[in-house]
Amino acid sequence: MKKKYLLILIFLLAFFLRFYKLGQVPPSLKEDEVAMGYDAYSILKTGKDQYGKFLPIIFRSLDDYKPPFYEYLAVLPIAAFGLNDFAVRFPSAFFGSLTIIIVYFLVKEVFENQKFKKWGKGIKAEDIALLSAFFLSISSWHLHFSRAAFEVTISLFMLVLAVLFFYKGFKKGKFFYFSSLIFGLGLFSYHSARVVFPLILISLVLTFQKKLFTKYKKEMIGAGLIFILIFLFYLPVMFSPEAQIRFLVTNDLQFDKAQEASAKNLLVDQKLGSSFWGRIFHNRRIAVFNWDNLYKVSTNYFLHLTPEFLFIKAGFPMCQVPGHGLISFWEMPFLILGLVSFLLFFLNRKTFIFLFWFLTGPLPASVTWQAPHPVRTMLFLPTFQIFI
């Protein structure tokens, strides 16, 4: 019973830190927040965005073509509180606070009834869950983005909830349907979700495939159909000109050099009489995976794991607490010790998802020219807090 009170206190702390003077701190809305707020207000009043498009599934915004979830979620608080800073930031603070509770239940669900090695045997799942929730509640990384209008805060909430429902499905099969639904809808929540959500879902299915397709075959068919239907609806969005513009503006891959190399190789193939195999191995899509691009992506990936990015500066002044890293210095020894302990004593089939989640987090930002990027990698969380 006492631990339930601790959870309530942790949630109240998280709620206070995210809502206290939300309309004043940070001072003034930044341009992205203004655009999202005005789009939400326009939807409320006219059903159209600021450019006159009726109920769009991609918001043109500042010509950066945003996913739709945040704008639609902001409609209700703007209707209730008016068009102001507090109302625009309300969805981020609200779902950021709820994420703390969901993380608690996820960690408890995953670590419950597990047999761990050596000294890990005496640790209770509820204790790990409470500590994870507490560290996330005071995380400067999560707190910073929960106090401003960032789509990634909503996306992280959906990801944690989808994984929780997946594990709940082993107790009640109907939760697989909810998990699949949220994994699918999450694709519309943030650009990075297009990479992270499917990879997390695939990892979960492959990890438990034997159990899923024997004991829960009916649920898997239903859940699969739900995700496929949503994904089919999402495909036109993913390949729309607006989405392509967003990708071309942010990516760091050298398409021009790849296409030039592809054209040269195809000419050589034609002269050698091997045009069939040339079309397979030297086409412009395969050519993108050249050594220059692979080196750039891998370098960007590991930049997100450096102490400088995590503990000193995040690279963008507006994306971090001034004079403070994404993770506090005092958390460093606990993070290192926790990660080593997890790998040695707590890693098994059921907990593997946290390691995979941790490794998947930097992928979306690794192909962009602004790497390392704290917003595009925020789906990293809450693995850091779980390891701590």
What are these regions (language model features)?
Residues K2-K296, N300-I388:
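Membrane-integral, polyisoprenol-dependent glycosyltransferases
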